[in-house]
C-alpha cells in the first residue's frame, strides 16, 4: 500500500511545478508520441527523471526541479518548457498547451498501456476513457503535517477565483462547450475529484487516505485527484485547480500568488487562527461559476453574506500579499477569450497553431 507520512512535511516554502502538455504533429493536431519522448532515449537535462505521461499517448507531463527561491520559479518553468519543445522537435513532434486540446477527439486517440492507467480505465470506465484534460499543479512545501491540512482546508475558497483566472479550455471534442473551463467539468466526472471537504487534522486525512486504498476505491494515494490536497509523499500542499496555460508567464503569475498565499495561511495557522467554516455547497457553486463564466462572474463570500467580484478579489489579494502576478493575469485577455477569438478569425487550424509552444 503506497501511503505517505507526516515525516514528509519538513520544509517550508519550497516550490515544484507540474505541467501537462499535448504532443502534436506538424499541423498542431494530437498524435501519439510517448513511446519516443518518454520511453525512448533518455531525455536531456533538465527533463531527466522529470518527464512522464498521462492517460493518453498524446499527453505528457513535466516537473521542475525543487525550487528553493520563489524568484527562480519563472526561469525553472521556462527552462523545462524549452527543453521539452526541443526534445519533441528532435523526434519530429511539437508541443501544445491548453486545458483541453480543441482538436482532440478521444474516441480516435490511443490510451497509454501503462498498467496503472489500464487499471483506471477498467475500474472507472467512460469518465476516464474520455479524460483528455491537462492541468497546472503547484506544490508548496509545508513543514508540519497538521499545518498542511489546515492550509489545504483554508485554500478551498480561493480555488474558484484561481480557476476563473486560469480558464483556458472552451473547446472539447471539436466543439465550443459554452464553458470557460470545460476541463474542470470533464475532470470532475471522475471519482475523488473536485472540492474536498475539510479535515480536522493530518491523522484524519491519513485515515481517509488509507481507507480509500484498503477498501479498493483507489489503487494508491495519487488517485485522490481533488482540487487541493496535502501531498503525503512530497510534503507539500498541492493546488490542482488551474487549466494548463499556453503562456509561461501566466504560469509564473499563478505560482507567485499560490506561494504567497500558502505562506500567509501557514503564518495564520502558527498564530492560532481558527479555520474558516465554509459550506461545501457554496464552494461548489463558486467553482461552477468559474467553470461556466470564467472572469465574468462574482463569487459568494466565505460567510455567504454577499458576493466578491473577481476585480475586487485581485485587488485585495495583490495588496494584501504584495504580489503583482494576479493583476497581470486579470489585465491580459483570458485564455478562453483568446481561443474563441482565434477560432473565429482563423478556424481550428489557426487555433491549433496558436496553442503550440514553438
From Swiss-Prot:
Stated EC number for the protein is 6.3.2.2
Under the heading InterPro entries, the entry gives:
GCL_type2/YbdK_subfam, GCS2, Gln_synth/guanido_kin_cat_dom, YbdK
Top-rank taxon, per record: Archaea
Among its keywords, does the record have Ligase?
Answer: yes
Database matches in HAMAP family: Glu_cys_ligase_2
Q: Which family does it belong to?
A: Belongs to the glutamate--cysteine ligase type 2 family. YbdK subfamily.
Return the protein name: Glutamate--cysteine ligase
Q: Which organism is it from?
A: Haloferax volcanii (strain ATCC 29605 / DSM 3757 / JCM 8879 / NBRC 14742 / NCIMB 2012 / VKM B-1768 / DS2)
Q: Source organism lineage? A: Archaea, Methanobacteriati, Methanobacteriota, Stenosarchaea group, Halobacteria
Q: State the encoding gene.
A: gshA
